[in-house]
Amino acid sequence: MKDILNCSLLAHNTFGIDARCSRFLEYASVEEAQQVALLLRDEGLPYIIVGEGSNLLLTKDYDGIVAHSAILGCKEVSVDGANADEVYVSYGSGVTWDDVVAESVSNGWHGAENLSLIPGEVGASAIQNIGAYGAEAKDLIYKVEAVEIATGKVVEFGVDECAYSYRQSRFKHEWKNKYLITHVTYRFSRHYSPDLDYGNIRQALAAKGVEGMPSPELLRQTIIEIRQAKLPDPKVMGNAGSFFMNPIVGRDVYERLAAQYEAMPHYVVDADHIKIPAGWM
């Protein structure tokens, strides 16, 4: 376990701001997460839990404790009742998210291709319900393992318990700062059925001369290129990535807008709600 006083947070925020915290605690195992949890509980100082810090804007030094996961690695796990088309893989919460996508594509585990190049770590995927180009983490998450800060006990939550919705979860609300996430198990598919109808994916593929179904590798590379064309590399120019949320409106509101703006892009969320891209607005 790392325990550093007056620690720089330069490596833990994508804006590249060299603010400092009073104390930095980093855990690399479940046992270390339990130690960190009890320290957070007993020290009586304010604390925050960070990943890569893409949702963090530090305007001054933080007078408190910053906790971070360095739990790495992954392993396939068996799940009762799983069908032959499914593969379940548990990742440490400190693994870089895009490494998960790259590994899944390389191994023929499908479903994460559209989530390529999203900044952050595995733990954050379960908190934020990260998403892009018609895909969300909740569509892949099977369960989340964590340590309860109040007790140091190891707990786990099935995907339904986390109450995921658009960029939301219980970890952002009633469970905020109550758990240190240690592992997330994702359910991938061995069957490749890509979603190409969101945003300008098809146009970008057509520009490459691809009219049919792209390979998973080509789809991932195309998503990466689309994202890189919109946003600078945070390692070169500090930024928070795409942090906004696209508005979701009722069908009645959508129909009024569509009557005014016939070319307005939109995506059906459910029978009563439509998502309108904020970038178009």
Model-derived regions, located:
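Phosphate/pyrophosphate- and phosphate-bearing ligand-binding catalytic cores of soluble enzymes
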Residues: I4-L5, A11-A19, L56, V154-M281
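Anion-binding (especially nucleotide phosphate/pyrophosphate-binding) glycine-rich loop
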Residues: M1-L140, V144, E148-A150
